[in-house]
């Protein structure tokens, strides 16, 4: 069941993203439509910090890791890894932040004419094309020096699907429509992106193995799924050809030491291959893509939910149309749905947050039927749900508590007791739900 635990109130604009801290399970980042980000400590239910990251709606929050940096950028001072926050906004920028200083390390111009998110996998960044919202750009970010290189520019997904459709011997997983175009000559703008990890294998005469080199050569063991305005969903695999390295080394005749060492690295062009295509949602635009234990889930403006067991799909009819958010509760292998109308559905449980109601009167002289109609209409007014995420249980919570316990001085017994009490009251997993009024409600699951 879902039980309301607490509410966070500091945002004055609609919540647009909630992102768990990469190393501290009790901390989350929340963003709103004004571009403000707040870092919360859920054990005390107070903001730790906040900053104006952008000038418009924040559409995506993620992290990028730098394993070779000497500066810990995760902002908690515990030396547990160099994580940096990545944010994406409708102000046409992507920014990477040092969480110790809240300073911007890198700013990337981007296309935010539509409402799609962006995706990042290791050091690979996927965004709508800078010149065409129907197409895709891919960048490679070097976190050592924050240099960025564009690997793929303005990739036309529609042309790739058409090409594979017309080539003999290639099978496209297209389900739910007789034609891929549906009387259109494109798929429209990209509405949603979702990266889902897969298993990349190589086959020998006797064994099948997975290696780091194989994964790097193929750009990583993942597929990026794109949901379009047309209702089409396309899955792509990125192929990164192996680097060709030319080394020249000159040694001194007297010292046997290197005096000149050059290494030249160059790649062939990266490319995409088509792995999946589904058009069941056509002509309704895709509004949500989610990950069900490495299986894609999709929804549009209708009440249809599609589970993509490639190449088979399962269709579920949900209670309401317009699914704003889908989260997967791993512990019980359950899906939780958040609808446009403000309802949350978990199994057979339905929850809503009502808007404040006007006072009513019990004066018997007023027509009772009119009062009843007014009350019924007011009861339909619910807060508009805008985002959901789950904070799952983690071993890091235990290590964090232990570290804090051992470093607390004996003279701060009252603070220590309060901290331990707050941690006992903070129980994972939690469902965090953001609303249009800027509030964030936490539910125990």
From Swiss-Prot:
InterPro entries: WD40/YVTN_repeat-like_dom_sf (IPR015943), WD40_repeat_dom_sf (IPR036322), WD40_rpt (IPR001680). One of its GO terms (biological process) is chromatin organization. GO terms for cellular component: nucleus. The keyword Transferase does not apply. Its main location: nucleus. It comes from the Eukaryota. Belongs to the WD repeat ASA1 family. Component of the ASTRA chromatin remodeling machinery complex. This is ASTRA-associated protein 1. The lineage of its organism: Eukaryota, Fungi, Dikarya, Ascomycota, Saccharomycotina. Keywords: Chromatin regulator, Nucleus, Repeat, WD repeat. The keyword Nucleus applies. WD repeats lie at residues 10-50, 53-107, 406-445. Component of the ASTRA complex involved in chromatin remodeling. It is found in: Nucleus.
